[in-house]
Amino acid sequence: MPELPEVETVRRGLEPALVGACFSHVHLARPDLRFPLPERFAARLTGQRVEALSRRAKYLVADLSSGEALIMHLGMSGRFDVVLPDGRQVSPGDFYLEGAGARAKHDHVSFALSNGARVTYNDVRRFGFMDLVPAAELATCRHFAGMGIEPLGNELSGEAVARLFRGRRTPLKAALLDQRLIAGLGNIYVCEALHRARLHPETPAGALADAAGRPTKAARLLAEVIRDVLTEAVAAGGSTLRDYVHTDGTKGAFQHAFRVYDREGLACTARGCRGVVRRVVQSGRSTFFCEVCQPAR
């Protein structure tokens, strides 16, 4: 599943085609994706201008001139094919490089825009979805209600980590993946951040706050490296796992900077470390870490 940096890469790739343009025609190849499409979906979009395109956690949000917001989630294999006004074809977030003929049968929603662009949503597994909600109710809609703070920007800090994790016995990795606490973090970047912070993934989350609820040095460092890892991954265009490529057809490059993720049995890359990357399973997900750099405490 694409994580925050990959979704941000898709957002940046879609922005030139969508923002400022109106939907002139919406074609639906089927009435549902993971969930049924909203009632009168095409009619509610047609003629509306896209005022802005933002990201919340792993969701894309298009603010419309009608006062509604179009929420889009890529699921496991969702992708967008874009024909720009100048005729160039790009794919801002391409996970499955199949032949064009085989891929076309998975084109489910197509948006024709007033600027001449065309945006097509393709989803092999059909785990993605789209919804329309009043923009004023985004924070309380069923997709975002109860969602945690954003890991990029000013919300995430050592103080926030201590406040969110205080008293929790949950393993640190599981707490970081809990979207009710911090929204948008996924398996890849949590493994990488924990390694940079030299924290064992099974450390009780509550250990990052002292008895008075103040952040420990580890909490401050963890907040810092989470931002660093995500910022670097966005700059690299995300991580290519299987066949992910971004807007201009090139692949994301952050996988070349992985320190532990998917490196089981390989030497730890930390300077002076002679440890080997291990893999364990936590809550059904693979966790990669170095026992030397990240000792259990």
UniProtKB/Swiss-Prot annotation:
It comes from Methylobacterium nodulans (strain LMG 21967 / CNCM I-2342 / ORS 2060). This is Formamidopyrimidine-DNA glycosylase. PROSITE patterns: FPG_CAT (PS51068), ZF_FPG_2 (PS51066). InterPro entries: DNA_glyclase/AP_lyase_DNA-bd, Formamido-pyr_DNA_Glyclase, FPG_cat, MutM-like_N-ter, Ribosomal_uS13-like_H2TH, Znf_DNA_glyclase/AP_lyase, Znf_FPG/IleRS. A zinc finger (FPG-type) spans 259-295. GO terms for biological process: base-excision repair. It catalyses: Hydrolysis of DNA containing ring-opened 7-methylguanine residues, releasing 2,6-diamino-4-hydroxy-5-(N-methyl)formamidopyrimidine; 2'-deoxyribonucleotide-(2'-deoxyribose 5'-phosphate)-2'-deoxyribonucleotide-DNA = a 3'-end 2'-deoxyribonucleotide-(2,3-dehydro-2,3-deoxyribose 5'-phosphate)-DNA + a 5'-end 5'-phospho-2'-deoxyribonucleoside-DNA + H(+). HAMAP family: Fapy_DNA_glycosyl. One of its GO terms (molecular function) is class I DNA-(apurinic or apyrimidinic site) endonuclease activity. The active site is at residues 2-3, 58, 285. DNA binds at residues 106, 125, 168. Transmembrane segments: none annotated. Belongs to the FPG family. Binds 1 zinc ion per subunit.
